[in-house]
Swiss-Prot record:
Database matches in InterPro entries: Rbsml_bL25/Gln-tRNA_synth_N (IPR020056), Ribosomal_bL25/Gln-tRNA_synth (IPR011035), Ribosomal_bL25_b-dom (IPR020057), Ribosomal_bL25_C (IPR037121), Ribosomal_bL25_long (IPR001021), Ribosomal_L25_dom (IPR029751), Ribosomal_uL5_bac-type (IPR020930)
Family, per entry: Belongs to the bacterial ribosomal protein bL25 family. CTC subfamily.
Organism annotation: Gloeothece citriformis (strain PCC 7424)
Keywords annotated in UniProt: Ribonucleoprotein, Ribosomal protein, RNA-binding, rRNA-binding
HAMAP family documented for this protein: Ribosomal_bL25_CTC
Any GO MF annotation of the entry: 5S rRNA binding
Protein name in the entry: Large ribosomal subunit protein bL25
Subunit description: Part of the 50S ribosomal subunit; part of the 5S rRNA/L5/L18/L25 subcomplex. Contacts the 5S rRNA. Binds to the 5S rRNA independently of L5 and L18.
Function in brief: This is one of the proteins that binds to the 5S RNA in the ribosome where it forms part of the central protuberance.
Keyword Membrane among UniProt keywords: no
Biological processes, Gene Ontology terms: translation
Any single Gene Ontology cellular-component annotation: cytosolic large ribosomal subunit
Intrachain disulfide bonds: none
């Protein structure tokens, strides 16, 4: 997915609350020259649109800064929001243009219908995303898990995942992702089965 954000260099001495009243969101870009950072501002409406398309620590974003001699791709590292209102207070980007492999978080997507579920079992999913390491151009949008073969009592762990070439998981390989649990005694499914066999 191609995602772009237009930024400007933040004026020196500008106050965050003053910028927000003007419809501008303070932001920072890290890693473009080692540890050096650039203070930026982004239009609030552009920031809201960006967050609808991009995910934190997952989506590569083309960051355009017309008044700075830099252009490249970055990850959204952090989004600061108002404690109870839905206002974005600050965005942090991390440049990946000059880096090798990076650590990102990728959501897990279950596909298929488990044979265990067809028998009345229940999918109990413990984690919905994992941390992986890969090159910026190899970041997967999601990792699909085919649950079709799973019977009641079967489970899938991080180490069971089939990842693309060049993508490695960072989480504990023994970490359980999901388990097909047997239906609880007296559940509607068991009662229906008993009635059908009566």
């Amino acid at each position: 997915m191609q995602v772009t954000i237009e930024c400007q260099k933040r004026p020196e001495g500008s106050k965050p609350n003053t910028l927000r009243r003007q419809g501008l969101i303070p932001a920072a870009l890290y890693g473009h020259k080692g540890t050096e950072s650039i203070s930026l501002i982004i239009k609030e409406k552009d920031a809201q649109l960006l967050l609808k398309k991009a995910s934190v620590n997952n989506t590569l974003v083309d960051v355009n800064i017309p008044d700075v001699p830099w252009s490249g791709k970055a990850l959204i590292r952090e989004v600061q929001t108002h404690p109870w209102k839905r206002f974005v207070y600050h965005l942090s980007f991390f440049s990946v243009a000059a880096h090798g492999k990076i650590d990102v978080v990728v959501p897990l997507n279950l596909v298929g219908e488990s044979s265990g579920v067809k028998q009345g079992g229940i999918i109990e999913q413990v984690i919905t995303e994992i941390s992986v390491q890969c090159l910026p151009e190899s970041i997967p949008e999601t990792i699909e898990i085919d649950i079709s073969p799973l019977k009641i009592g079967d489970s899938i762990s991080v180490g069971d995942l089939q990842l693309s070439e060049g993508v490695t998981y960072l989480d504990d390989p023994t970490q359980t992702i999901l388990t097909v649990m047997a239906p609880k005694k007296g559940s509607a499914t068991e009662e229906e089965t008993a009635e059908a066999s009566a």
